[in-house]
């Protein structure tokens, strides 16, 4: 009851704060800042007690928040940490050291020396195909010497009119060619020896068919078969005669 009556009867006046608009205009803050900086300059000349030695460098007031106007700033020594809210953030010009950047995962892979790519262990290396001598085409002179694959299917040779005319002329004089003459004709007509040989074989068969001549190969085979069949009968007759004479003598 005594406290409440004292508060009621006292001459306490509520503080009058300026409205927010005055803060935005800067008049109130500007006057207070001038008073604060003036008191800060006055506090720099203040000599503290002899507990801590005075440093050689001059002291500068902080621009940030600090003690109120009229208070002196203590000198900073080597073992004393500055007090106040601004002491936690350091000097205005100083910056916190940035942390070192974390190494990227791809940077390590690039720094390592890259060697030749190794095939996976499950896959085997392809071996070159083996080409045996019988798989090569060597019986034709006009074949590509660099070709090492299998023998392709032979195509029918198309002779030109000039080649056929020269071959017919040669066949009219000689139905059978020697090796030397065959080589000469092959070089003259730009053909191979095998092509010349096959053409002459076919031309001889056609000539025999046109003249109705018997095939020499068929006649020789038939004559040999007849001779072989007649030989056993000749040997059987003397044996039968000898057997008959033996029976009569008995």
From Swiss-Prot:
InterPro entries: Antp_homeobox_Deformed_sf, HD, HD_metazoa, Homeobox_antennapedia, Homeobox_Antennapedia_CS, Homeobox_CS, Homeodomain-like_sf
UniProt keyword annotations, A-Z: Developmental protein, DNA-binding, Homeobox, Nucleus, Transcription, Transcription regulation
Region described as Disordered: 31-126, 210-250
Intervals of motif Antp-type hexapeptide: 131-136
A GO molecular-function descriptor: DNA-binding transcription activator activity, RNA polymerase II-specific
Basic and acidic residues: bias regions: 240-250
Cystine bridges: none
Main location: nucleus
Bias (Low complexity) ranges: 105-115, 220-229
DNA-binding region range list: 152-211
GO cellular component, as recorded: cell junction; nucleoplasm
UniProt function note: Sequence-specific transcription factor which is part of a developmental regulatory system that provides cells with specific positional identities on the anterior-posterior axis.
Record family assignment: Belongs to the Antp homeobox family. Deformed subfamily.
Subunit structure: Forms a DNA-binding heterodimer with transcription factor PBX1.
Protein name per Swiss-Prot or TrEMBL: Homeobox protein Hox-D4
Organism: Mus musculus (Mouse)
